[in-house]
């Protein structure tokens, strides 16, 4: 039996993993995705400004460090596993069951599943799956791949406009199509992309995709006006789909441990990450309380709070907080290496 099972491998879950290790707890970390990082993997090239004391840098750099930190104390990690139930058998005895039927036991549970299981909405046209490993994209991993390319973006929200704005600086051309009369993204961003000569095509959708000779790459896109039905084919090097996300939070609605909920998607909790069930803590975007802010920085704070409370739940006579890291014995040898690197 582990001390704590953390469900969710985003920033809050990863920091909870680190801090629980700092508090000398054994940790199990479970995530439904094939990689750790949560929603941060959706926008790897975005520049993150709002983490205190961290200089602005691309999200993928912050994510790399966050994962490294979360794994510092060598938690037991399970990827590609969807949790379907949390059962409180008794005080300090929980069972976490996965879709595959695996049952993991621990003394406490931390729920850090963000907005739930997030998957980009797929383009609904015939044969789309054959292009997903080549030049059809649902997530922009690197802007550099679009250098000097003709790029089509389908979607009129903030994410689509953000991608259009950044890609237009290096691409040969960027075209944005969306079904409505106007984009739903911020008006200021619409002005910015227009200034970069991004072509905006309202009331337009992708009718179907035309592949190359071996059907491995998209060579043309047939666009359709949603009102007139008129179509025309345009050659593009890459196609990006930004139609929003499908979210799944069935764990919270179907779990045996009936937590008080704020709405269908979020746990009703408190600033210290406690929930209506002792021994279960919620941190990051999944928890709601009056003082909640949805920032990566606050996700880190939530993770530390959840780990501290799990520690005192498991061991009531434990200190409410851990030692500050600069004085912690566990980092003594690592600190020597860091000091030598920076001073000599």
Swiss-Prot record:
Residues involved in FAD binding: 12, 31, 39, 43, 83, 118, 285, 326
Superkingdom to which the source organism belongs: Bacteria
KW Flavoprotein (keyword) present: yes
Reaction catalyzed: 2 reduced [2Fe-2S]-[ferredoxin] + NADP(+) + H(+) = 2 oxidized [2Fe-2S]-[ferredoxin] + NADPH
EC number: 1.18.1.2
GO MF entries: ferredoxin-NADP+ reductase activity; flavin adenine dinucleotide binding; NADP binding
Pfam families tied to this protein: Pyr_redox_2 (PF07992)
Keyword Flavoprotein listed: yes
Keywords: FAD, Flavoprotein, NADP, Oxidoreductase
Cofactor binding, note field: Binds 1 FAD per subunit.
InterPro entries: FAD/NAD-bd_sf, FAD/NAD-binding_dom, Fd--NADP_Rdtase_type_2, Ferredoxin-NADP_redctase_2
Cofactor: FAD
The protein's assembly and partners: Homodimer.
Similarity section: Belongs to the ferredoxin--NADP reductase type 2 family.
UniProt xrefs under HAMAP family: FENR2
Protein name listed in UniProt: Ferredoxin--NADP reductase
Native source organism of the sequence: Staphylococcus aureus (strain MRSA252)
């Amino acid at each position: 039996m582990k001390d704590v099972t953390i469900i969710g491998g985003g920033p809050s879950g990863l920091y909870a993993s680190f801090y629980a290790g700092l508090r000398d707890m054994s940790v199990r970390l479970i995530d439904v995705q094939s990689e750790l990082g949560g929603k941060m993997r959706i926008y790897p090239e975005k520049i993150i400004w709002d983490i205190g004391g961290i200089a602005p840098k691309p999200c993928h750099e912050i994510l790399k460090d966050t994962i490294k930190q979360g794994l510092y104390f060598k938690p037991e990690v399970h990827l590609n596993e969807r949790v379907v139930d949390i059962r409180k058998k008794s005080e300090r005895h929980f069972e976490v069951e996965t879709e595959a039927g695996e049952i993991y036991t621990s003394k406490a549970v931390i729920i850090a599943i963000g907005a739930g299981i997030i998957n980009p909405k797929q383009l609904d046209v015939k044969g789309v799956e054959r292009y997903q490993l080549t030049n059809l994209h649902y997530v922009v991993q690197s802007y550099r791949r679009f250098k000097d390319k003709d790029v089509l973006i389908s979607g009129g929200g903030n994410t689509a406009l953000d991608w259009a704005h950044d890609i237009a600086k290096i691409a040969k051309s960027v075209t944005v199509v969306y079904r409505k009369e106007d984009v739903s993204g911020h008006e200021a961003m619409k002005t910015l992309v227009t200034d970069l000569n991004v072509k905006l095509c309202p009331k337009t959708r992708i009718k179907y995709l035309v592949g190359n000779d071996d059907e491995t790459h998209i060579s043309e896109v047939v666009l359709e006006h949603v009102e007139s039905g008129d179509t025309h084919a345009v050659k593009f090097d890459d196609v990006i789909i930004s139609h929003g996300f499908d979210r799944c939070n069935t764990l919270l609605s179907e779990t045996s441990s009936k937590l008080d909920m704020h709405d269908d998607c979020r746990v009703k909790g408190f600033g210290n990450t406690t929930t209506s069930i002792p021994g279960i803590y919620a941190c990051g975007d999944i928890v709601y309380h009056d003082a909640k802010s949805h920032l990566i920085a606050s996700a880190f704070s939530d993770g530390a709070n959840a780990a501290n409370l799990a520690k005192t739940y498991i061991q009531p006579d434990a200190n409410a907080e851990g030692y500050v890291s600069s004085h912690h014995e566990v980092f003594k040898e690592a600190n020597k290496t860091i000091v030598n690197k920076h001073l000599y």
